[in-house]
């Protein structure tokens, strides 16, 4: 697979249980007092698999084999552990080395990030951190079935976003919609076919481009401004944007400060960004995105004719701050 791999199953169930070499494994405060060497705990080292940079825990209900756990209420709970390990490590290395979402000295150099697989039918997956120490994410099997593991790529993006804050590298505005937009952009970096996989996001965005940049309805649908910024400023720029974000600012204010842009200059840049978006004119994914280029519907349906022969944009489609019509 190209990375270190370790599984509790390979170590046996002896009294001399040995943890894998390499980075340490953090035990969160909420599990203080639990014996993770014992198989009776909710999470256990005996139900853990590791890559060089991540520790994957599964709840007790899975038993000893993620490939053949007992069904839950008639639903299969199997997870392809080898694919999960491969993709997690691939995502991790890209986010660390290419996007540079963590800097040297990060606590992630000491500890493995943590993936907690829950024995549940809930469709939940979310990323964050444990105790402002190490990034983590939590997921149920129904979010771990696609081979590309898009949900995992997104949630691990959140793990890195929060890792940066845990490392004391800024406050990222105290939190806002760009966390979701940023995680989608990170997913798109490791899966350039993201729009093919989740075309419903693109279809929905085309109907809502008039809404404000960072409008909550669009934050999962529109990583395109971040793609434009990263193409202009380099891949590591987005991670630095998160580190530079201050309470009292929003991401636009932070970007303008970092680039020393006036409001007029920023407006011009946003217009250029949307010109690129219409044709999906991004070098990284240009050939892949041809099916989606210039695919906006006829805008005349969004206009109303006035008595003097002019047309006016309908009220519902008037652009909000940094929104656009096409």
Question: What are the roles of these predicted feature ranges?
Answer:
Residues 3-6, 31, 43-66, 72, ...:
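Extended hydrophobic/Leu-rich segments
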Residues 50-175, 179-183, 193-196:
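Juxtacatalytic substrate-recognition/specificity segment
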Residues 129-130, 146-151, 166-237, 242-281:
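Acidic/His/Gly-enriched intrinsically disordered linker/tail segments
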Residues 1-49, 308-326:
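N-terminal low-structure segments adjacent to metalloprotease catalytic domains
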Residues 29-37, 65-75, 210-211:
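Surface-exposed intrinsically disordered loops and tails
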Residues 9-11, 56, 274:
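Intrinsic disorder/low-complexity segments
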Residues 249-326:
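Beta/coil-rich, acidic/histidine-enriched accessory regions frequently appended to metallopeptidases
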């Amino acid at each position: 697979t190209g990375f270190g791999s370790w599984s509790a199953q390979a170590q046996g169930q002896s009294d001399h249980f040995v943890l894998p070499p390499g980075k340490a494994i953090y035990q969160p405060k909420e599990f203080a007092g639990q014996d993770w060497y014992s198989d009776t705990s909710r999470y256990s080292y005996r139900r853990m698999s590791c890559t060089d940079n991540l520790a994957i825990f599964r709840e007790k209900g899975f038993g000893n084999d993620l490939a053949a756990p007992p069904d839950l209420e008639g639903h299969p709970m199997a997870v392809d552990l080898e694919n999960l390990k491969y993709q997690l490590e691939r995502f991790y290395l890209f986010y660390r080395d290419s996007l540079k979402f963590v800097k040297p000295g990060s606590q992630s150099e000491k500890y493995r990030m943590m993936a907690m697989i829950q024995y549940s039918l809930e469709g939940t997956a979310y990323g964050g951190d444990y105790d402002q120490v190490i990034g983590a994410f939590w997921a149920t099997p129904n979010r771990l079935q696609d081979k590309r593991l898009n949900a995992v790529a997104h949630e691990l993006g959140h793990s890195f976003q929060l890792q940066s804050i845990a490392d004391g590298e800024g406050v990222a505005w105290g939190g806002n919609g760009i966390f979701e937009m940023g995680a989608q952009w990170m997913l798109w970096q490791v899966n350039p076919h993201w729009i093919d996989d989740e075309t419903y996001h693109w279809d929905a965005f085309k109907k809502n481009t008039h809404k404000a940049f960072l409008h909550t309805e669009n934050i999962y649908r529109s990583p395109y401004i971040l793609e434009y910024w990263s193409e202009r400023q380099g891949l590591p720029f987005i991670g630095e944007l998160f580190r530079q974000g201050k309470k009292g600012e929003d991401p636009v204010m932070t970007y303008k400060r970092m680039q020393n842009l006036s409001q007029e200059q920023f407006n011009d840049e946003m217009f250029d960004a949307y010109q690129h978006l219409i044709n999906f004119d991004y070098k990284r994914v240009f050939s892949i995105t041809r099916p989606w280029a210039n695919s906006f519907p006829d805008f005349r349906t969004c206009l109303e004719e006035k008595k003097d022969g002019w047309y006016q944009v309908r009220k519902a489609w008037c652009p909000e701050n940094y929104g656009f019509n096409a």
